[in-house]
Every structure is written in structure tokens, then in C-alpha cells.
Swiss-Prot record:
BP-aspect Gene Ontology terms: ribosome disassembly
Family, similarity comment: Belongs to the IF-3 family.
Record key words, sorted: Cytoplasm, Initiation factor, Protein biosynthesis
PROSITE patterns linked: IF3 (PS00938)
Organism: Pseudomonas fluorescens (strain SBW25)
GO MF annotation terms: ribosome binding; translation initiation factor activity
InterPro entries reported in the protein's UniProt record: T_IF-3_C_sf, T_IF-3_N_sf, Translation_initiation_fac3_CS, Translation_initiation_fac_3, Translation_initiation_fac_3_C, Translation_initiation_fac_3_N
TM ranges: none
Cellular component terms per the entry's GO annotation: cytosol; membrane
Function: IF-3 binds to the 30S ribosomal subunit and shifts the equilibrium between 70S ribosomes and their 50S and 30S subunits in favor of the free subunits, thus enhancing the availability of 30S subunits on which protein synthesis initiation begins.
UniProt-annotated location(s): Cytoplasm
Protein's name in the database: Translation initiation factor IF-3
Subunit structure: Monomer.
Amino acid sequence: MIIKREMRQDKRAAPKAPINENISAREVRLIGADGEQIGIVSIDEALRIAEESKLDLVEISADAIPPVCRVMDYGKSIFEKKKQVAAAKKNQKQIQVKEIKFRPGTEEGDYQVKLRNLVRFLSDGDRAKVSLRFRGREMAHQELGMELLKRVEADLLEYGSVEQHPKMEGRQLIMVIAPKKKK
């Protein structure tokens, strides 16, 4: 099967605003390079003004009547937008859900290790999913699991708050804890 290269690139490319001669309207509301309103002018006049200032005429709002166009350096504005998107992406933190698994018979030493890991996850700003798995006859003693999750909740009170209270899903008791907001 042959796939044309142009078709794949078109899907990835963002829709571009019409510029210069590609603007189809006869009249446009023109905004100057410095942001001032010039008014409603013919497309030929707008192109002439853009050409005199050695900039591009870019259609900002095609929905308006007449369409709004601005005199600007199109390449520079695209570059600035890409830079802003990259900066926003860089500053964005991906919140993950980390999971710690307990058992009804989890001993004190193991409990403390798992609790330390939960504290670390919440301090890093990640949500924590605490699951407690019952095997075999342990299902008859679900109250022990509930007590263990209540203890975890009490121990993590200063680091986070319960987002999803303990509930049974099959043979597991699951609780989700969200980190406290930083001031």
C-alpha cells in the first residue's frame, strides 16, 4: 500500500491563516503594524500598505464582516507562537498516579517503608493510589483492610487529602490520595 507523503504532512500541519494574496475578501478591517485601527479599506489598499512597510497582511478573523486583517511579520509571529507553546509545554508538570499495594497482614516495618514512599509521592506532587488486595479467606475480614486504610489516611493527613474514599473493586480495596496544594 502506497501512502503519499504530502497527505501525511497535511494532517500534522496546523491550519494556517490566509496571508497576502491568499485573502479572498474584497474589503477588510485593517489593523496597522503597531496595533492601531486603520479602518475598512479595500484588499488592494491593505496589500499596498503591508508592502510599503515590508510586512505581511495576515487575516486574523475570517468570521467578522468585513474580515479583520493585520499588518505584521508573519514568520516572526509564527516563531513567537511556537516559542510560547514550547515554554508552556516545558512548564507543565505531568501529574502521575503512583500505586502502593498493601495486604491485610502487612507488618509494621513494611508499613513504614510503604508509608515513606507514599509521603515521597505526595511531596513530589503526584497522586497516590493505595490498594489492598485480599486473597482467599481474607475476604471474610474486610474490616481489617478498612482499618489499615483508615490508618494510612490518618498518617498522611498532613501530606494529602483523600480524593477517593476506600471502596471494594473485586478483591481489592482502593483509595486515592491527592497531594495538598502548595502555597
